Amino acid sequence: MTATAQQLEFLKNSIKSIQDYPKPGILFRDVTSLLEDPKAYALSIELLVERYKNAGITKVVGTEARGFLFGAPVALGLGVGFVPVRKPRKLPRETIAETYALEYGTDQLEIHVDAIKPGDNVLVVDDLLATGGTIEATVKLIRRLGGKVTDAAFIINLFDLGGEQRLEKQGITCYSLVPFPGH
């Protein structure tokens, strides 16, 4: 099933836009409103599973926290394992970490060292692509463990914030269901 224009418009309309959140001048795209609609949520998962069902994916990685909400059901639909990437000190087993830049400062992500095996074909899933910094750090973690990442999937792409171009420079093909301007 290829996504139809009607299906994509339905998904787009299920995402609420909140002006001046979290600070003045920001138009926040609230994917939690999509989660509140079981038809929209199910459709978003079905479309991602359909796109990647024959891609040879062996693991799906989701980034904290909303990436878990989409990545885990996509992994189930593909019949593969799900691997969470989390903020520091949230995973109980041995981890490796990757630091990445924020607008003001840095942050860090971690993954279990035994979660990805050399040669795993990994799909990264998150709710939203903006500047691409979080996903770039996630991809670095996966590659450090020997995993192969060629694709990342998103519900929303804030297309004018440069994330897709940033990830393409890392050899990542980005796919999103709903494009929005970031400003």
From Swiss-Prot:
<dbReference type="GO" id="GO:0044209">
    <property type="term" value="P:AMP salvage"/>
</dbReference>
<protein>
    <recommendedName>
        <fullName>Adenine phosphoribosyltransferase</fullName>
        <ecNumber>2.4.2.7</ecNumber>
    </recommendedName>
</protein>
<dbReference type="Pfam" id="PF00156">
    <property type="entry name" value="Pribosyltran"/>
</dbReference>
<dbReference type="InterPro" id="IPR005764">
    <property type="entry name" value="Ade_phspho_trans"/>
</dbReference>
<dbReference type="GO" id="GO:0003999">
    <property type="term" value="F:adenine phosphoribosyltransferase activity"/>
</dbReference>
<comment type="similarity">
    <text>Belongs to the purine/pyrimidine phosphoribosyltransferase family.</text>
</comment>
<keyword id="KW-0808">Transferase</keyword>
<comment type="pathway">
    <text>Purine metabolism; AMP biosynthesis via salvage pathway; AMP from adenine: step 1/1.</text>
</comment>
<dbReference type="GO" id="GO:0005829">
    <property type="term" value="C:cytosol"/>
</dbReference>
<dbReference type="GO" id="GO:0006166">
    <property type="term" value="P:purine ribonucleoside salvage"/>
</dbReference>
<keyword id="KW-0660">Purine salvage</keyword>
<keyword id="KW-0963">Cytoplasm</keyword>
<dbReference type="GO" id="GO:0006168">
    <property type="term" value="P:adenine salvage"/>
</dbReference>
<keyword id="KW-0328">Glycosyltransferase</keyword>
<comment type="subunit">
    <text>Homodimer.</text>
</comment>
<comment type="function">
    <text>Catalyzes a salvage reaction resulting in the formation of AMP, that is energically less costly than de novo synthesis.</text>
</comment>
<dbReference type="InterPro" id="IPR000836">
    <property type="entry name" value="PRibTrfase_dom"/>
</dbReference>
<dbReference type="InterPro" id="IPR029057">
    <property type="entry name" value="PRTase-like"/>
</dbReference>
<dbReference type="InterPro" id="IPR050120">
    <property type="entry name" value="Adenine_PRTase"/>
</dbReference>
